Amino acid sequence: MDSSGPDAASAFVREPTAPVREPAEVALIGFQDQGNLGMGYLVAVLRRHGCAAEMIEIRDGPEAIAKRLLERQPLVVGFSLIFQFFLPQYRRLAQSLRAAGVTSHFTIGGHYPSLCHEELLTNFPEIDSVVRYEGEETLVELVDRLRAGEDWRGISGIAYVRDGAVAATPARPLVQDLDSLPFPDRPYKPERVGGFPTLPVLASRGCIRRCSFCSIHTFYRTAPGKVVRVREPKKVVEEMLDLYRRHGVRVFLFQDDDFPLWGRKGRRWADELMGRMHDSGLADNAIWKISCRAEYVEPELFANMREAGLFLVYMGIESGVESGLEILFKQMTIEQNLDAIATLKRLEIVYSYGFMLFDPSSTFESVRQNVGFLRKIVGDGSAPAVFSRMLPYGGTPIRDQLAKEGRLRGDLTRPDYDFLDLRLNEYYRLLSDTVRPWIHNNGLSNQLSYAWDEIETFARLTPGLRGAKAYRRALGKLTAEANERLFRLVEESSLAFENGDRSPLDPKRIAAYCERARTRLIDLRNVFVADNLDPLTDQVNVDCSSGPVLRPQVH
């Protein structure tokens, strides 16, 4: 987007790392996109135990980070690594810090280090220890041992190298009472969507499902203890109110792996959460987003959630063909996914979704069938078309299966696999390069997705905006047109490639179309914002310090 109007530059604006005054005994380094609640909880728990701790954004760069660490001389430097794709970046940083003279104990945590500690320690010799699984208690004990000059290698929940061999202690049990943890530390200014401050919150940890491509359930099932733990609604709302008052947060992003709506217990929990949102005034003054499975999307429940502030639902649909759902072990049906989307449309709740156009079971025909499924759900322009390829993350069942089949390819940081029809390997590569301006990073689909999130944020937090319906119609028309172009490209190119013809893949033509579509989107958006600049600015600048204002009840 251009530089006019609220939050025009991008969907989220990253603020510089916030300094802490006291020398930090622990410095945690990682990405801070949309906040990093994992690091935030670690810092909060460390401080509760009398340990000075801080967070550092990894994108501050090696020189700035080294300078900061040399000034503060922390006892422990912790690296927060979720995806193995970033391992080279983390290792280069660790090497740079050692070369600069940083002598702190280097530890690392996250999904990949926890599940593949032997692989990581073998390929990342700068690391002294791995904190495995949930790290709050383990990190505190590690700091205590190092502070006292005692041997730390016997504490639960770590891995390390001794005498050239990788060793691991028994896994520490998961935190069973999430409400026993302090609210996570948030040293960064809230990111913004549509000009409104937004921050992540967490109502639960864990996932009851066993999707074959996902490392989340493996992460929680490998450690002892109850897999899914849910916070009390009272505590969740207390945290939201605190963020509303202190930071003016009006948009909350629930980062739960699977928002806890399953079964009767989940419905009762949701009812209490919504009741407390209404009683506190949050339902009238804030909106929130969740991620959940399609089977949880029930009309009555989600209508009530919408009234309590729900505005955006993310679902991992992943496939529109039975073979894909089966190999991904989604334990879902095509009809359930279609029904969920239809329900959200009827309730006028914005949605987004994950979708793997390519998976290990893919054929040229299934790719076209998946496009047909996508056309059913987003052919009307209700959301942009997005898709990806399933990747075999470390610690996932699908990675082990592909290895047994002899199809696993790639390397440590870029795992890959062969399709059963080897022609699909080349087709995927060419298609991915062709549609890069469309579906990658800040491509057209992401720009459209942000536009939908933004208009819904505007409409829900600033009712009565001039031209909102017309803008939505124009946005839907543009989205539908872009989706259909993408669908036809995949259908025509896959059929042609299957028959030995690559001519439909024209990256320059696609890039030119995406640029034209982005220009149209910017123009549409700018006209709408310009027509409503005063009411939008008034709402963005509302003083939230005294708490939400309750609307009068109509009897």
Sequence positions of predicted segments:
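N-terminal [4Fe-4S]-dependent radical SAM core
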Residues: 2-23, 155, 160-203, 548-550, ...
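Residue-level recognition of beta-strand->loop/alpha-helix junctions
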Residues: 30, 55-59, 218, 355-357, ...
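Radical SAM enzyme core and accessory elements
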Residues: 1-29, 47-51, 62-75, 79, ...
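Radical SAM [4Fe-4S] cluster-binding motif and immediate context
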Residues: 179-351, 359, 372
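Catalytic cores of alpha/beta
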Residues: 117-123, 301, 361-376
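Glycine-rich beta-alpha loop elements in corrinoid/cobalamin-binding modules
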Residues: 15, 25, 31-32, 38, ...
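Hydrophobic/aromatic residues located in beta-strands of well-ordered beta-sheets
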Residues: 26, 106, 155, 252, ...
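Flexible glycine/acidic-rich beta-alpha junction loops that bind and position SAM and/or redox cofactors
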Residues: 117, 209, 213, 262-264, ...
